[in-house]
């Protein structure tokens, strides 16, 4: 069994940063598309189009999805844990609480991942340095979003609980998804199977609740945003997700939640000419310190230096 209580390699860190950029971009795509498309229909389009894209890529590479019943049961469970449940809870929760507060609750995903992994796995045990790093990263996310993110804390408790449950669902998905590598399923095939499973679960709900055939035809920029959300953030994103999960483990994978705010900040500076506030610099420093604690190499360097 792979030892996952090791520092991540440079390649794994690079893939994690790339994943944070892909998922950070999803907020832009969603912000454009949700103005014309209801949330449930948008989520269904996201996973359905991603499934079609991944199937085309798999076929062009001469690869096929596995046929074993246990693998397809796994795809359905991953679709439930990683898409259907958290997407629905987050959409509902964000309709009742500020998006900044929702982002802070969503950033608890790595905490739940490390606690659950400590209980149910043999090779992802909790250490003091890892716990300190996770708490520092969570504080960094809160600082980057700003003090306004914590307004409303303690009100709309059910909505806040929904976001926390979504974070727990993501953490459970990371643990459950480890088995696909053991079954010999390639990351791209696992990503394709998961979004197919999500599509099977979500399509009937979208048809019943939103009745999308009554919706007006979306504009071209909305269609482009949906394609970006499906192709870049979802198809490419989940392929990377399962690639990282196979070698770096659940806890390390969920660190992407801490990297998304800095990635979004970087994109804003480079492409939108946005400025960086003092609280964002503080948050960036806390996240960097937290990631260094979790990685462990910097702490070992100072120990040796002493």
Regions found by a protein language model. Give the residues of each.
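Hydrophobic/aromatic residues within transmembrane alpha-helices
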Residues: 33, 42, 46, 93, ...
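Alpha-helical transmembrane segments of compact multi-pass small-molecule transporters, enriched
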Residues: 26, 49-53, 105-119, 135, ...
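Hydrophobic transmembrane alpha-helices of multi-pass small-molecule transport proteins
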Residues: 54, 76, 116, 128-148, ...
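Helix-helix packing/entry segments at the starts of transmembrane helices
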Residues: 43-45, 83, 102-108, 176-199, ...
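Juxtamembrane helix-entry segments on the extracytoplasmic side of multipass membrane proteins
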Residues: 8-13, 35-40, 44, 67-73, ...
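Glycine-/small-residue-enriched transmembrane alpha-helix faces in small-molecule transporters
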Residues: 1-44, 92, 152-179, 200-202, ...
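Specific transmembrane alpha-helical segments of multi-pass solute transporters/efflux pumps
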Residues: 22-30, 55-106, 143, 230-248
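Transmembrane alpha-helical segments that form core, pore/gating elements
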Residues: 54, 113-115, 119, 143-144, ...
